[in-house]
UniProtKB/Swiss-Prot annotation:
UniProt pathway: Cofactor biosynthesis; adenosylcobalamin biosynthesis; cob(II)yrinate a,c-diamide from sirohydrochlorin (anaerobic route): step 6/10
Catalytic activity: Co-precorrin-5B + S-adenosyl-L-methionine = Co-precorrin-6A + S-adenosyl-L-homocysteine
Signal peptide: none
Lineage: Bacteria, Pseudomonadati, Pseudomonadota, Gammaproteobacteria, Chromatiales
Keyword Nucleotidyltransferase: no
Name the record gives this protein: Cobalt-precorrin-5B C(1)-methyltransferase
The enzyme's E.C. designation: 2.1.1.195
GO biological process, one term: anaerobic cobalamin biosynthetic process
Length: 373
């Protein structure tokens, strides 16, 4: 795949990470090629599409075929250096003549999911093809139709090879998307390890929970804390928000779109960072201050030796172990400090917050009970 303006790399950002293309961009390329094959009997290879921000990538076709009343084309998704589950998957579109005056009609084929719950950008019952890709798929068909002097009335069935199996590795089952993957991509360009993509998933999870009338959501930093908080509160899957490192991103969205009860659950290291004011608790944003953690222990009665051992520990978990050995309720104290950070971000008139700390085995080691301010 190539682009007439620049290669899909991350050189502009000064990194070695290679950019890729979203499933939506691949589907748009396959759709334009399939439509052209349906109308003219020949397939453009490579096929060029227009994306937002003046990008015009060209995609090589991996498959193309046509028969009586249908044409199919597909491209292999290149996710660049992003660990996307669909990297290397065949994204294909089968085009068939549509009803006169109906324009472009999109259908979910094998491996593409169908929305079953409200709260997402696509209505329940519709193929899980987000508004961004829908827009540039339709734009590509309009441009191809104009070039061929043909109407735009066409039915496009999108498919993703092995998509139903791959979807189990995504948030789709929790969001109420059944049968396969979503076709995503606001701009069509896939930036490796994009924070924006994760935050968007957090927001969609909150939207689905609100639409389902759920009044208690739990944001967790990882799988262990998610399983632990679900067991602790007996929450349905729809109430679980995989916030990862983006505690601030979740809380800021909840300020705009509140839920009455919000639990923040995580391991000792990440919740300690939240307690110390970090809103993004990834290690790249900095390390927890062990000296400050030792001071917290001091306020609980830790002696000088205990504080020194904690301040010079190799990890937060090691410092916690020392405090627990001394019989100090450090987990509860850190949870209260983390809760105060969180309360500064939400609307106290609309939500109350609880913080839970878990160790690596999923055992609760700290809690700050429900509070609004």
């Amino acid at each position: 795949m190539s682009e007439d303006t620049s290669q899909p790399t991350d050189q502009q950002a000064g990194t070695a990470l290679r950019r890729g293309w979203t499933t939506g961009a691949c589907a748009a390329a396959a759709a334009r090629a399939a439509f052209t094959g349906l109308v003219s009997g020949s397939f453009p290879d490579p096929v060029t599409i227009r994306l937002p921000r003046d990008r015009s990538p060209a995609f090589a076709l991996a498959v193309h075929a046509c028969g009586d009343g249908w044409a199919r084309a597909g491209v292999i998704k290149d996710a660049g250096d992003d660990p996307d589950v669909t990297h290397g998957a065949l994204v294909s579109v089968t085009a068939r003549p549509g009803a006169p005056g109906r324009g472009v009609q999109l259908r979910a084929g094998p491996g593409v999911g169908t929305v079953r719950r409200s709260g997402l950008p696509v209505a329940a019952g519709e193929p899980a093809i987000n508004p961004g890709p829908r827009g540039y798929i339709e734009q590509g068909i309009a441009e191809a139709a104009a070039a061929l002097s043909a109407p735009t009335d066409v039915t496009l069935e999108l498919a993703i090879e092995d998509g139903e199996r791959l979807a189990a590795q995504t948030l789709n089952p929790r969001l109420g998307i059944e049968g396969g993957l979503s076709v995503l991509g606001t701009t069509g360009l896939l930036v490796p390890f994009s924070c924006a993509a994760w935050i968007d998933a957090i927001q969609r999870g909150i939207d689905v929970a609100r639409a389902a009338g759920i009044e208690h959501v739990a944001g967790s930093t990882g799988r262990t804390s998610e399983q632990a908080v679900q067991a602790y509160h007996q929450l349905p899957d729809e109430a679980l928000i995989d916030m990862g490192d983006f505690v601030g991103g979740m809380l800021k969205y909840l300020r705009r779109y509140p839920v009455p009860r919000v639990t923040i659950a995580g391991g000792v290291a990440k919740i300690t960072k939240l307690a110390q004011g970090f809103l993004d608790v990834h290690s790249r944003r900095g390390q927890a201050d062990l000296a400050a953690l030792a001071e917290t222990a001091g306020r609980l009665g830790a002696d000088a030796t205990c504080r020194e051992v904690m301040a010079t520990a190799n990890t937060v978990a090691e410092a916690f172990d020392r405090a627990q050995a001394a019989g100090l309720p450090l987990g509860d104290a850190v949870a209260r400090e983390a809760q105060q950070t969180a309360l500064n971000l939400i609307d106290p008139a609309c939500s109350e917050v609880e913080v839970l700390l878990f160790d690596r085995r999923g055992q609760r080691v700290g809690r700050a009970g429900w509070a609004r301010d």
